[in-house]
Amino acid sequence: MSRLKKYNEFINTRVGFFSLLIGLLWLKNMFAYVVDFHLSIQNPMQLFILLINPLSVSMLLISIGLFIKRSKVAYTTLFIIYGILSIWLFSNAVYYREFTDFITINTMLGAGQVSTGLGESAVRLFRWYDIFYILDLFALPVLLFKKKIIVEEKHPRFRKAAALSALSLLICSGNIFLAEIDRSGLLSRQFSREYLVKYLGVNAFTVYDSYQTFQNNQIRAEASPNDLKEVKSYIREHYAEPNDSMFGIAKGKNVVYIHLESFQQFLIDYQLTDENGVNHTVTPFLNSLYHGESTYSFDNFFHQVKAGKTSDAETLMENSLFGLNQGALFTQLGDKNTFEAAPNILNQKAGYTSAVFHGHSASFWNRDKTYKHLGFDYFFDSSYYDVNDDNSFQYGMHDKPFLSQSVQYLEHLQQPFYAKFITVSNHYPYSSFKNDEDGFPLATTKDETINGYFATANYLDTALKEFFDYMKASGLYDKSIFVLYGDHYGISNTRNKELASLLGKDSDSWTDFDNAQLQRVPFMIHVPGTTNGGINHTTADRSMLSLLCCIY
């Protein structure tokens, strides 16, 4: 009984009322994480981060009321800020049910353009359990009015209010620190709004999104048409006439892009020696393509990505544009810019239907919005596939079931089509596979990441062979050309010295030049029916977009 009395006495203080609001908001966030957002937890660190991330911004904002001397104004301020944060969380929960995404500043700015009919649509998204989000917004004023919660007239000391605000900043700093440990580059790469909410919370994500939106608007405001003069002048001066022997050799054929995740050039023709001294070819199928007479291969092709990683590679290949110096173009500008991208060009010039296939969340790298601006007609994300724990991991569906299940959608695309398949199995941390897929030997270095890299690359290779076998059996093979490219490095420079021995080099004599050479990734254009292919040693020439245009 004494404990209950002490609790009631504490709640009847301003700090106690503040603590009650923080506790209720924390519970609502936990409820939303589990019931509406379905945020996945892979390790104890992520669980701890998820438990603390609703606190920082909430505590900082609600604590504003503790600095106000007049009691009624103070309590009103505390409750209003709490109410706004509760409604904002509820709004995100409802929005997520329809769009599997979170509300951004740009979403709100554009809401007026599609406001007609939104009211009825939103009502249909409500659930019976939504009462949990809003019940206390009615109950707390009643409890205050009936003096079940007493308004404390005494103003808390400035030090106490400041200490609570400082605690919120400390939690925020710790939250970001732990998030960067568990997910390096979270803020700089900005690859997924879901990841940002998972690691930072809804409110912190909104603050971060507001800053990014302001920064992007400033950059756009400073842009001038005069900036293009130098670019246009350079293009005119360096114009290259099409090669008559190659121009138009693939006219009217389907285009199939295959995005090789984290695949480096040194894997081509590489043989891994196991602990018994037996050599195992890592990529026999890709080797046969690479050296085939119908493939135009490039062995000096360097990835050119930064924080955007995979999305930067897509930006480059689709538009002949580099990514951003900071952050990812897909997430910052993908749903705002107007692009002259390959899907658009092929549709306008030759009536191509375009589609992207990817067994991961549509919002990852902001793909669902960016692809529309690139001109893609369809985007088949994870919601179109039978994804389960056995055939997927944290970055999406494994390549074999992904490519196999993609066939049903590819078959129904109107020809000629432009289709891109984004594979993910050869992705860090390069873990071994379950069941019958766990067969290729691991390397035996001290670095587990390097050890698994060859096995996942081999899995990708066998998945591609199965896909090409299907294309041949269906009759689509001879009607298509295939563009295969590695998006970026798989083994980072910090691990290269450990990799050196597997490449026949001495780690003690490893240089920056060796690091640079490992930034090469495969690039092949396979054109069935041609016989004048080969390996090109071009160092820097035309972009993928210009090469594609030349053979069409």
Give the positions of each predicted feature.
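Low-complexity, intrinsically disordered short peptide segments enriched in small/polar/basic residues
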Residues: 8, 12, 225-228, 478
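Conserved acidic functional residues
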Residues: 200-214, 262, 479, 496-497
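Transmembrane and membrane-interface helices of multi-pass
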Residues: 2-211
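Solvent-exposed soluble domains appended to multi-pass membrane proteins
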Residues: 233-552
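Short coil/turn linker and secondary-structure boundary residues
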Residues: 103-109, 223-226, 540
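Glycosyltransferases that elongate glycans
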Residues: 65-69, 74-75, 81, 229-232, ...
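Exposed alpha-helical structural elements
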Residues: 113-114, 230, 285
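Membrane-anchoring hydrophobic helices of lipid-metabolizing enzymes
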Residues: 210-233
